[in-house]
Amino acid sequence: MPSGCRCLNLVCLLCILGATSQPARADDCSSHCDLAHGCCAPDGSCRCDPGWEGLHCERCVRMPGCQHGTCHQPWQCICHSGWAGKFCDKDEHICTSQSPCQNGGQCVYDGGGEYHCVCLPGFHGRGCERKAGPCEQAGFPCRNGGQCQDNQGFALNFTCRCLAGFMGAHCEVNVDDCLMRPCANGATCIDGINRFSCLCPEGFAGRFCTINLDDCASRPCQRGARCRDRVHDFDCLCPSGYGGKTCELVLPAPEPASVGTPQMPTSAVVVPATGPAPHSAGAGLLRISVKEVVRRQESGLGESSLVALVVFGSLTAALVLATVLLTLRAWRRGICPTGPCCYPAPHYAPARQDQECQVSMLPAGFPLSPDLPPEPGKTTAL
């Protein structure tokens, strides 16, 4: 080993690495360094082994957390007088020095720094700090994890501090999280503990079932048709000549009909095709408009209208016929509906019997016959 370093174990290997061939100095650290717990470095300093500390490596390192103790070897915690415990943090005289028991409780030392309190009736707790108040008397009635509060027993009544999702005097009621109807589009709300979930109908998704699933995402339409999304459905806007749900059908081309001999159902309406008029018979094309058929059928009289028209016509005809019959009957009896209609007796006969009654359709005073002009005030008109 070089003379410039004295190492006693592998911990001082650094001394070897830093050693030189120079002779030892007069102020060699071996005279004051505890070589049992360290070694001398080339610079004359004392390098301590692990677990030792101090200028000369004379002091052991205590256990971490040791409060009222010392050590003889590294990582020890030897308690001083009056202290106990693994970390020497327990006061053996706690019952006399600190009086930890409250409300008249008696402190009893158990050794090793431990103690317990003998509480007076009506009090409890490690230090007799709690009174047997409403919570204890009621048997701690708060449910579902609720905390009973009574100001450590000194309150007149207790209160329950409920966890989220519960309510009531004893936290016994589960709050209905579906009360505000958070689920949309007819979804079913399932209540939980401080939460809810939505059971979405087909075609919707999301936490609140507000997302309409795109039924066109799979591109169901064929023939290059445009897809229009709906609620749990879709429509295909097929190009001309194609049909079906996904435009999978090829529609037959319509055959033009002749003007002379049109072949069509009796309920169809034939509409001349737009464009210039044909120059010869049979050269024009006809177009069958289904919309026009429906429109004309809708604009016709319904069954109820026809029945009302027949009834009204029958009543009118019966009224006219009754009027005519009554008029003829009165005429045959020589009675006008509005009064006498014959000339006075002095012109034709001494009485009204067997006289010919002439009914005038002219205003009063107009001559009824060129041979017999009426006398003033003698003609009676209907």
Swiss-Prot record:
Residues 1-26 form the signal peptide. The keyword Zinc-finger does not apply. Its main location: membrane. InterPro entries: EGF-like_Ca-bd_dom, EGF-like_CS, EGF-like_dom, EGF-type_Asp/Asn_hydroxyl_site, EGF_Ca-bd_CS, Notch_Cell-Fate_Det. GO terms for biological process: negative regulation of Notch signaling pathway; regulation of fat cell differentiation. SMART domains: EGF (SM00181), EGF_CA (SM00179). Regulates adipogenesis. Glycans are attached at residue 157. PANTHER family: CRUMBS FAMILY MEMBER, DELTA-LIKE PROTEIN. GO terms for molecular function: calcium ion binding; identical protein binding. The lineage of its organism: Eukaryota, Metazoa, Chordata, Craniata, Vertebrata. It is found in: Membrane. CDD domains: EGF_CA. Pfam families: EGF, EGF_DL_JAG, hEGF. This is Protein delta homolog 2. GO terms for cellular component: membrane. Residues 27-305 are extracellular. The gene is Dlk2. It comes from Mus musculus (Mouse).
